[in-house]
Amino acid sequence: MLSVTKPALKRLSRRLVRKGAADGMALRFKRREGGWTLRVEHESPGDTAFSHDGRTVLLLDAEVSKAMADMTLYARKVGQRSQLKLRRTERRGD
């Protein structure tokens, strides 16, 4: 399953506020040419949900969850801002 760091969850929460997302809405990873994008959507049955301070901030459907099984979402500081980044998680013992 995708691993998400606490700073990344906080960044997702701030992004939802900035976008004016209504209660019950969260960011969902979607495939796009050359990578991934985040869209504000409602939670669907079967989604994997990640929360921050009691609010769902990130959603993955089953297909995306499988594709991101060996990845970590983290926040990287760039100047005064933080950016969300994905990286492959190192497997131990392989």
What is the meaning of each model-derived region?
Residues 1-19:
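Long, hydrophobic N-terminal alpha-helical segment
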Residues 18-20, 41, 64, 77:
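Sterically constrained small-residue positions within well-ordered secondary structures
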Residues 2, 48, 66:
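Flexible, active-site-adjacent loop/turn segments at secondary-structure boundaries
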